[in-house]
Amino acid sequence: MARKIQAIRGMNDILPDQSSVWLYLEKTVADVVKSYGYQQIRFPIVENTDLFKRGVGETTDIVEKEMYTFDDRNGESLTLRPEGTASCVRAADQAGLLFNQTQRLWYTGPMFRYERPQKGRYRQFHQIGVESFGMATADIDAELIILSARLWQKLGLLEHVELQLNTIGLASEREAYKAALVEYLTEFKDQLDEDSQRRLSTNPLRILDSKDESTQAILKNAPNLEDFIGEESQAHFDLLQAILKANGIPYVINRRLVRGLDYYGKTVFEWVTTHLGSQATVCAGGRYDGLVEQLGGKSTPAVGFAMGIERLVLLLETLNLIPDAAKFSTDVFVISMGDDAELASFVLAERLREENSNLVVLRHCGGGNFKNQMKKADRSEARFTIVLGQDEIDKGICQLKDMSTGEQQPHSIDDVATYINAKL
């Protein structure tokens, strides 16, 4: 027997018992973002490696340790996209959508990072991203956060997530703060965890969100980022808070929140939950005014966020918030006995679908006696089973069995669709 080929570790199949939940989540997101005027954009899974080195940052964990990178046959370095923002910027700028324009865009699809697989964290994972371009003021930051809050409300998650906010200021303000932070932490370098020691010379802001207890204890007396924030950045942050308060969006300010990608500035935010253990963040984003220019485009203000589909599905399942309507179910199972009845069953099944496009009609295929077909009808968990035989064809009727009650009655073939639609 040939050896079975398995899926790659950390890259999971989405099987039919879960795909209906994914479709429900994706449709809910699509409906919400459309109501705010966002249009979908799609871009390749594979990009030039330099896009992520320049966009995400060469000293980030993603670029240093987590990217799937390879050379093609022409020797060009390519990478499976580890996140969507840089690709969205590249695609929109290449198409001429950004300069002197405002754009509201969203996307969804798989991303790839070489990480240790664990619950809620995978090597192939799926994100939904929402990005706004051409608007530099805090009102668009607020719009995105309010949009995400509306999504949580639609999904029943609003009371189960918390919004955390921070401002990390302008690049010049961050540089001044980094210098002060490095100066302070250098005295304690040997006491920092291994990752923080490495980040001290590459990406010191990331030390702020270290999970190591000893490092956090050292940080208690470290310089505060808020002391380095200038008037412009603070005014931006104050307006954002005012808009959120006016719209009844609760939040907490987390001064240690810095985000892990180099392109962020001013506003950063995360939606976190206590229901998923260590994988607490379900949505994160912020402002990235310098990224378009950094990737070769004209200076363009921008802000956006991304959310992980796997984590959201896990959260919905953990909280038992998946509505019955989101689960796949069969409404009608059609069985037939005899050649004439088989032909008639095709016609009837199509008529049912024509009269109600939301109806799920499963028609038995593959032959078999009546008993075997009824067993399959039972296993389908359909609400109704339609039985067609030669006697029914001759009389212009079908037998309709309500599988929830066991009651079976004859119905006119012409009228059975109306009856079923009224009952469902």
Swiss-Prot record:
Signal peptide stretch: none
- Catalysed reactions listed for this entry: tRNA(His) + L-histidine + ATP = L-histidyl-tRNA(His) + AMP + diphosphate + H(+)
Q: Gene3D superfamilies, per this entry?
A: Anticodon-binding domain (3.40.50.800), Bira Bifunctional Protein, Domain 2 (3.30.930.10)
Q: What is its main location?
A: cytoplasm
The biological process GO terms on file are: histidyl-tRNA aminoacylation
Q: Which portions of this protein are annotated as coiled-coil regions?
A: none
Record-level Gene Ontology MF annotations? ATP binding; histidine-tRNA ligase activity
Its keywords, alphabetically, are:
Aminoacyl-tRNA synthetase, ATP-binding, Cytoplasm, Ligase, Nucleotide-binding, Protein biosynthesis
Q: What is a single Pfam family found in this protein's UniProt entry?
A: HGTP_anticodon
Localization recorded for this chain is: Cytoplasm
Subunit architecture: Homodimer.
**What is this protein identified as?**
Histidine--tRNA ligase
Task: Give the organism the record lists.
Answer: Marinomonas sp. (strain MWYL1)
| Taxonomic lineage from the root | Bacteria, Pseudomonadati, Pseudomonadota, Gammaproteobacteria, Oceanospirillales
Q: List the gene name.
A: hisS
